[in-house]
């Protein structure tokens, strides 16, 4: 499913004064594409995801899922945050079950999906665990499973690995790359991590500081699976880093 941002402008009111967070964002994601957005803190990256998820509204422009304007929270879009946001009184299984709360599924299909995504996210043996018994990485696996269990067409990821240690982060990045290859999900990833963006994305969108505008879009012409240590990937990392530094240096 394609996702289109058409001339999006967004303001917040701060101390009675309008603050422009996003300005004239024009971006399209093709079906099955993974696009990473990178930029300085406060440039509106997470706001863009909230708009696509129907959690927030825009003053100007429109967002389309396929040819359908986003009005309210779309059924075929899932949003995963940096914090797992698991309910502490629910087991891993029941936290994942929440992702299907509004779906009209048979009990057998609900259980089949839970088992499938437990396996996909490497959570076998943790089905009956409580959130306080999980490491940060395992909790984030549960959050991603909850986001996937409704079988969305579009997955929005808001720095999902930002709070994890380096090894766990790389493991979950590799798992996401595998999931992306196994499905036709359209994925929009917000990150501060240049290596993560280049390792995962088909294109990297570099944002300028607030008000957030698209400074540059860089295609990542690397085949999957990707080697983090390859010369080609390191060159792409350098190109994205340079574009990011240039965007930060521009007076807006």
Predicted regions and their residues:
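Short coil-to-helix segment of the ABC ATPase nucleotide-binding domain corresponding to the Q-loop/switch region
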Residues: 90-98
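Conserved ABC ATPase "signature" region
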Residues: 97, 101, 108-126, 178
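The feature captures the beta-strand-to-loop junction immediately N-terminal to the Walker
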Residues: 38-40
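Hydrophobic anchor residue at the start of the ABC signature
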Residues: 144
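Conserved ABC transporter NBD signature motif
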Residues: 61-73
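Conserved signature/switch motifs of ABC ATPase nucleotide-binding domains
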Residues: 129-132, 150
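Helix-to-loop junction immediately C-terminal to a conserved catalytic motif
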Residues: 53
């Amino acid at each position: 499913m394609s996702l289109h941002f058409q001339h999006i402008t967004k303001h917040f009111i701060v101390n009675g004064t309008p603050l422009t967070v996003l300005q004239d964002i024009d971006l399209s994601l093709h079906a099955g594409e993974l696009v990473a957005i990178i930029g300085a803190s406060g440039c509106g990256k997470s706001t863009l995801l909230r708009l696509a998820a129907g959690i927030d509204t825009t003053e100007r422009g429109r967002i389309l899922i396929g040819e359908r304007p986003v009005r309210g929270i779309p059924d075929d879009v899932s949003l995963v945050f940096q914090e797992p946001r698991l309910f502490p009184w629910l087991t891993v299984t029941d936290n994942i079950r929440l992702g299907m709360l509004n779906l009209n599924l048979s009990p057998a299909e609900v259980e089949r999906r839970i088992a499938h995504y437990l396996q996909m996210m490497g959570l076998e043996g943790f089905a009956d665990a409580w959130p306080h018994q999980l490491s940060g990485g395992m909790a984030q696996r549960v959050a991603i499973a909850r986001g996937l269990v409704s079988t969305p067409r579009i997955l929005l990821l808001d720095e999902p690995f930002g709070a994890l240690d380096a090894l766990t982060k790389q493991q979950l990045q590799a798992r996401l790359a595998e999931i992306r290859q196994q499905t036709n999900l359209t994925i929009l990833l917000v990150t501060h991590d240049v290596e993560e963006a280049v390792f995962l994305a088909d294109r990297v969108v570099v944002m300028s500081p607030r008000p957030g505008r698209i400074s540059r879009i860089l295609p990542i012409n690397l085949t999957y699976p990707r080697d983090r240590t390859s010369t080609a990937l390191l060159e792409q990392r350098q190109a994205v880093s340079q574009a990011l530094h240039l965007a930060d240096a521009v007076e807006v």
